[in-house]
Amino acid sequence: MASVAAAAVSVPSFSGLKAETKAAPARLSSTSVVRMAPVVRASASSDALKTVGKALLAASSSLLLVASANAATVKMGGDDGALGFYPKDISVAAGESVTFVNNKGFPHNVVFDEDAVPAGVKTEDINHEDYLNGPNESFSITFKTPGTYEFYCEPHQGAGMKGVVTVS
């Protein structure tokens, strides 16, 4: 006949226990550490600030002069390769410059129609008849006399590559 054995297991109960929350006292060291801020002479600091300020003023003044002297940039040829000046109508103040930049590498130039510039302006002084053949080749023209200046690209005039500069 079979026999059955029973085993008894005792499980301790943890109900009602509380964790102690006291912290151990901190230990103090007899070694002291003193941190000091760096010493800066006020005159050296203000001299440096004055120098930086002058440099910033000079740089910003130079940028303003360049920005006002070069009033417009005209791409010769479109980003998609189209023949044209972009923009084709430009307005600037007298004494300002327009920079023409060859955009895609076709041979381009800028020729002013002698019958379509203000009286007294010599087109040979402002024409750029030499071809710009490579991308990003450029030249600038400063317009001194107020009025309307019509220009074109000599090899692409028949394709409508024309523009107008209005100087006030």
Curated annotation (Swiss-Prot):
Q: Which PROSITE patterns match?
A: COPPER_BLUE
Q: Which Pfam families match?
A: Copper-bind (PF00127)
Binding annotation for Cu cation: H108, C153, H156, M161
Q: Which CDD domains match?
A: Plastocyanin
Q: Which domain of life is it from?
A: Eukaryota
Gene3D superfamilies under this entry?
A: Cupredoxins - blue copper proteins
Bilayer topology: Peripheral membrane protein
Annotated Gene Ontology cellular components are: chloroplast thylakoid membrane
Q: Where does the record say the transit peptide is?
A: 1-70
User: Localized where?
Assistant: Plastid, Chloroplast thylakoid membrane
Keywords from UniProt, A to Z, are: Chloroplast, Copper, Electron transport, Membrane, Metal-binding, Plastid, Thylakoid, Transit peptide, Transport
**Which cofactor does the UniProt annotation name?**
Cu(2+)
- Which parts of the sequence belong to the Plastocyanin-like domain? 71-168
The molecular function GO annotations come to: copper ion binding; electron transfer activity
Q: Which family does it belong to?
A: Belongs to the plastocyanin family.
Q: What does this protein do?
A: Participates in electron transfer between P700 and the cytochrome b6-f complex in photosystem I.
Q: What protein is this chain from?
A: Plastocyanin, chloroplastic
State the organism of origin. Physcomitrium patens
